[in-house]
Swiss-Prot record:
Keyword Zinc listed: yes
Localization of this protein: Periplasm
UniProt cross-references to NCBIfam families, sorted A to Z: PRK11546.1 (NF008584)
Organism, scientific name: Escherichia coli O6:H1 (strain CFT073 / ATCC 700928 / UPEC)
UniProtKB keywords: Periplasm, Signal, Stress response, Zinc
Family recorded in the similarity comment: Belongs to the ZraP family.
Secretion signal span: 1-26
Gene: zraP
InterPro entries with a match to the protein in the record: Metal_resist (IPR025961)
Name the UniProt record assigns to this protein: Signaling pathway modulator ZraP
Length: 139
């Protein structure tokens, strides 16, 4: 009976070690935006953090407004009968918000370039780190 307990404990320990080591083979730790990224100096890290914080502060209100307009747009489409003039007006507002967000992104990219921060490869084709078709906007 004692021998069977030891065998069971050894098997459980080996199983736990095997399950814990699988993350080593899964290329963990990269995350989005880390593919082929050059290591940043401490000055670049500080500059990147400031640029990122500034961009977030400027863009978060616009992003929230865009989400609200999407809900409004969908509600107008679901109305019976749909009011095309209201739908077109909300669509135009959404386009203006997207344009404002794009302008902020360009300003952020310019600030990063001026700070000497490499842009990296981004999310890649399909929106998931460089491969496949199952990313953002693909079903």
């Amino acid at each position: 009976m004692k021998r069977n307990t030891k065998i069971a404990l050894v098997m459980m320990a080996l199983s736990a070690m095997a399950m814990g080591s699988t993350s080593a083979f899964a290329h963990g730790g990269h995350g989005m935006w880390q593919q082929n990224a050059a290591p940043l100096t401490s000055e670049q890290q500080t500059a990147w953090q400031k640029i990122h914080n500034d961009f977030y502060a400027q863009s978060s209100a616009l992003q929230q407004q865009l989400v609200t307009k999407r809900y409004e747009y969908n509600a107008l489409l679901a109305a019976n009968p749909p009011d095309s003039s209201k739908i077109n007006a909300v669509a135009k507002e959404m386009e203006n918000l997207r344009q404002s967000l794009d302008e902020l992104r360009v300003k952020r990219d310019i600030a990063m370039a001026e700070a000497g921060i490499p842009r990296g490869t981004g999310m890649g084709y399909g929106g998931c780190g460089g491969g496949g078709h199952m990313g953002m906007g693909h079903w």
